Each structure stands twice: as structure tokens, then as C-alpha cells.
Amino acid sequence: MKQTKIVASISDRRCDQDFIRKLFFAGMNVVRMNTAHASEEGIRTIVNNVRAVSPHIGILIDTKGPEVRTTGVKEPIHYNIGDVVKIFGRPEMDSSHDIVNLSYPNITDDVKVGDDLLFDDGELDMKVIENTGPMLVAQVQNEGTLGAHKSVNVPGEHIDLPALTEKDCRNILLAIELDIDFIAHSFVRSAADVKAVQDILDEHHSDIKIISKIENQEGVDNIDEIIEASYGIMIARGDLGIEVPIEKIPGIQRRIIAKCIKAKKPVIVATQMLHTMIHNPRPTRAEVTDIANAIFYRTDALMLSGETASGKYPLEAVQTMARIAEQAEKDKSPVNDIDPMEEGYIDQKLFLAHAAIEATQKLGVKGIITDGETGQTARDLAAFRGPNPVLAICYKEKLQRWLNLSYGVIPIVQKDQISTKAMFTAAVRMLRQKGYLEAEDKIAYLSGSFGEGGGTTFVEINKVRKIFDNSYSFNLPSNGIEDK
């Protein structure tokens, strides 16, 4: 069984329950919705169908974030090298061959002569040769075609747009209403952009978790403060590969993953992981290697975009990614391990998590069980990227869904208030039934002696057979609930 989590993008054009169920059984852990391509009605349909399939599937919704786009065109416009174009910030006017209008009125304030304007994910490049104040004059650098409402990137420049659009604010309120689990905020440039979303969530007493999408140089430069302000990070390599030199992407990816592990926060690698499978039933060797390398770098999760949202082989894409992940996890080298413990800093719960992981290697422990109200202990354990699964007992379904982004964590819900001993033995029994444990295997239990808010205080290690053979004399620290 794979330990790397899979996020799959789903469109309202293909979101029936049978389709979602197939992806779920194939290995999908979280459904992602792209608000750039979904109406409110479509979002509601996706959420209702996902919840009908299983309350255990996480749901993530994107914001559009601060972006610049072209305006409408009557028909696609063809450009040749050397064509000269006037560019205005006039969102209310359509574009033509000689005049391109953009959605951002103040574009001339933020762009200088010599900058490249990259249209449609970098497909068309225009270099600015003059800035008159009211308009830019640019020269086309490559032959290409420009359609309506295409993306515009200006590598190396700060575009002074607000962190949230009006549509973003409406979609955040919709996410709160629908009790969605994650908001993936696009084009995050600093902690202030994360705070803009968090302020809305706080105002409405929502516990939705924020995933910050790193898509430009500013986000890379400010990654430490962004990680601190976020629940998790998505390395969105599409726009990132336009905004920064593409040869820098692997190194940026590796460094961000390492920083997230140090912070004990989930990290997702996204974009073009199995892009070929939008149209073909098999991936390229390079795509297989890309997925494996993300796992060798120690990512928590991988994301599929067009492969599952609009591709011809969505189920096969999830199945393929799951198979590659499972094999890559077996092939990982310890030389790439990242120690989440800060040198010179001793934290009790992290020390105990490290001890439990060490036990899997030195004492042959086959699995770790933990429980808690926040999932922090499970995320601490996930940061060590241990070889065996972590079973996290969750006391609410939402926590279970939040942990669907954490490597190696199997979250299950325990709604009934039962004793520590009863909960632990039930968890061991479940692991045995699922084939993770044999009678002679050792199991570790990481928990606290003082109930909710009391912190992690002990590690229990025992043989499965011994636990059940001595059920009357076997004891654990009490959580205040007596065995019946």
C-alpha cells in the first residue's frame, strides 16, 4: 500500500458518484476543485457527490489569486516574430491584433522596458520596448496564437494586485458554507496573502486549512514566512516554471519539501506529473521518473490536474501514480532522509515521535498508533517518513480529512468515547484485519496521559499477541473513561 497521498482534480463536467468512487478506490485521497473552471452550482455538485461516496475523502478548492489575463477576442489572433503590439490595462475592452488589453488597469506602473510579457502559460512572448505611461509597446519574440482570457506573466516583477479577487471572496464563503477541508490559495507572495484568507475564515469561525501555492519568485523568496502562516504548501510548477528559469524548478522543489518537513507541515508537488496521460494510456519514462523523484525528495502528496479533470484516462492516471508511488517508496535511499528535529532544540512530543520511528528500525516495530484532537502528533510522525504506516485515531471526521495530506498516515474516526485501552486494542485489531500486522509483530502507541490538550507523554511498545493474550492485565494511562 502506498504512503504518498494523491490529490486528483475533478471537473463539474465529470463528477458523478461512480467516477469519484473509482478514483477513491484507486488511491485518491483528496479531491481538488479549480474555481477558474467551475460555477457555484458545479462546486456544490462536486462536494455533494464526494460526500455521498465517502465522508473520508478530503476536498480542496482553489482560489484564483492575484492574476493578470487578456480580455476577450473575436477569434484567436496569430502573431509572427517581430510584430509590434500596443498593450493597455483596459479590462472592459476586447483585444485585437494591434492592441491587447489586459484585466489589470495599472499594468504600466509595474512593468518596465526590457521585461517579457508571457501569455498563455508562456506560449507567446512579447518583450516591452517602450512604456509611455498610458500604454506599453511590445515586440513579439516567437510565432504563436493568442486567445481570449489567457494568462499573463511578467517574470521578475511584482504585480501590485490584491491577494483576493471578489470571486475569491465569494468562493471562500461558499467553502465555509459547504464545510470544505482545504483552500489552496493561488500565487501566494508573502504571509500577508495567507493572512488575507485567514482573516475571512476567522471572521466566520471556520477551521478550513490553507494550502499556499508557490507559483512565483516572490513566493520562493518568502517561503519561510509563508510556511509558518500556512497549514501546508503546494509547489505549483506550472506558473512557477514561467515565473522563474525552468532549470531552477527541481532545486526549488527539493528545498521547499525539506523546509516543509522541518516545519512538520504537508507539502504537495503539482503540475504535469502525468501530463501525457491526458491523451495517452501510458506515461512517458520522464513522467515516471518525475513522480519517483518527488517521492525520493520526500513529498507528502502528489497532484493530478488535467489528467483527471478532463483527460481521457483519469482512472488509469490515478492507478499509475499509485503504482509508481508504491514502488518509489520501496526504492527510497536513506541518503535523502531529512531530519525534522532542529539541532539543539529538544521538544518532548517530537523526541517521542522520533523514538517511535527509531523503534521501527531497531526493534522491528511494524506500525505506530496515535490519537489526538489536532493531528499534530500524526504530522510529527509523518515528518520522519518512516517505513511503516501511522494509524491516527481521530475524534472528528474533519481531522481525518486534514490528515489525508500527510505521508504514511492512515486516519480513522473513533466517534464513541471509549477508554484508552479499548481504543488502542480496537486499532490493533483493525490493523490485523487489514493485513498490516501479524500476531508476533510489535506495535508502538504514541499518546498522552492527560487527555485533550495534555500533550504527548509516552510511547508504548508491545507484541500484538501479548496484548490480546493478556487483555485483563494489560493497561495504559487512563483518559478518564473506564473500561466497560
Model-assigned labels for residue ranges:
Residues M1-K484:
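Non-catalytic helical/linker scaffolds that mediate oligomerization, partner binding
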